[in-house]
Amino acid sequence: MSVQEMLNSVMKSDDRIRYATVCDMEGQVLGTKIREGIKPLLNDEEHREALIYAVNSMKVREKLSAKLGKNQYVFAVYDNLCRLTMPIGNKYMLLLTWGPETTLDIFNNIRNALKQT
């Protein structure tokens, strides 16, 4: 399945998802999908910086995986949004955002969408 098909599937899984992007493990964006009517909170440079930070954090977690187990996802709650980063295999990372009012049931929708890809 292509990156664009994966992004479409994830975005369709839950209307509360605002933003989805897939990048490689160097932080290079491979594809992005933004919900219609949503204005990103970060500009392109800030988004790139956030991706590099998330990728580097994921690499650190990978070093600890022998003791902690494989990283499934990282969930961060901010005042203005929630963010999930999730490895896709060993080469890619998925980053999703949604509003801070969203309940955790969104995880099941995302996981189900990724299982179909």
What are these model-predicted stretches?
Residues 1-117:
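Non-catalytic interaction/Regulatory regions outside core domains
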